[in-house]
């Protein structure tokens, strides 16, 4: 079952390690004429990091491409980022990352003096257009690399959920209701062996449910 990670010391140390690797990635990309900026997203950014029993913890980062030679050459961008990230990982005695459809994921990382908890980094490559819309770089793999597709896929607008979360936090005690409900939702899906609802979807559901409950009670 999922539980919140309460060890603040570990979280601070792990996120510092992850951010250090991401900063090195930024520097490496700059040498390849790619200007980028990373930021922590997901449960790590919301201080809602969960762990399923003793399974590894994931820290999600977005790597925003600010400028490069050709923003539309998605394959070149993905490959340059992947190669640069692998170089950074090797320089830190870590294994190469895995390349999935929408992210680059490190192998499991652990501290030698605290090996009970493993963690990994998921890096999504994103960019923002002049209208403020966010796009995620996706890599659809064919049965061989010749048929692979690389493209920018527009991400759902999360502004309205941020506004709802802000409204909930303005009422004392109600954010704890969101935290509990979020954990309940994740565990309900886990009991059903439903792995089609990622953490962000569970978070949106929790925010919507609590926000609607507060509206019905005329708290908002």
Language-model features: locations:
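Helical scaffold of the NTase/Pol beta-like nucleotidyltransferase catalytic core
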Residues: 1-40
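Alpha-helix boundary/N-cap detector
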Residues: 5, 9-16, 72, 76, ...
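Short glycine-rich, low-complexity/disordered patches
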Residues: 24-41, 90-107, 191-205, 214-220
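Active-site nucleotide-donor binding segment shared across nucleotidyl transfer reactions
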Residues: 28-59, 63-71
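Conserved catalytic core of two-metal-ion nucleotidyltransferases
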Residues: 29-32, 78-131
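A broadly used, surface-exposed interaction patch
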Residues: 61-88
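Right-hand nucleic-acid polymerase module
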Residues: 100, 113-220
């Amino acid at each position: 079952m999922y539980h919140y990670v309460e060890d603040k010391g570990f979280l601070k140390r792990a996120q510092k390690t992850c951010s250090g690797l991401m900063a090195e990635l930024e520097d490496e990309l700059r040498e390849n004429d790619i200007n980028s900026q990373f930021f922590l997203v997901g449960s790590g950014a919301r201080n809602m990091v969960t762990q399923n029993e003793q399974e590894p913890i994931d820290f999600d980062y977005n790597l925003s491409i600010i400028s490069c030679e050709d923003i539309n050459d998605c394959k070149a961008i993905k490959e340059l980022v992947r190669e640069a990230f692998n170089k950074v990982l090797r320089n830190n005695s870590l294994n190469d990352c895995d390349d999935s459809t929408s992210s680059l994921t490190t192998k499991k990382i652990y501290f030698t003096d605290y090996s009970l908890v493993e963690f990994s980094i998921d890096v999504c490559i994103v960019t923002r257009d002049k209208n403020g819309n966010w796009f995620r770089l996706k890599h659809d793999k064919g049965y061989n690399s010749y048929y692979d597709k690389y493209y920018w896929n527009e991400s759902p607008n999360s502004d309205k959920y941020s506004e709802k979360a802000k409204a909930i936090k303005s009422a004392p005690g109600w954010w704890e209701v969101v935290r509990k409900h979020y954990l309940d939702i994740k565990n309900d899906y886990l009991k059903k062996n439903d792995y089609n609802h990622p953490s962000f979807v569970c978070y949106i559901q929790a925010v919507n449910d609590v926000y609607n409950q507060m509206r019905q009670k005329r708290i908002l």
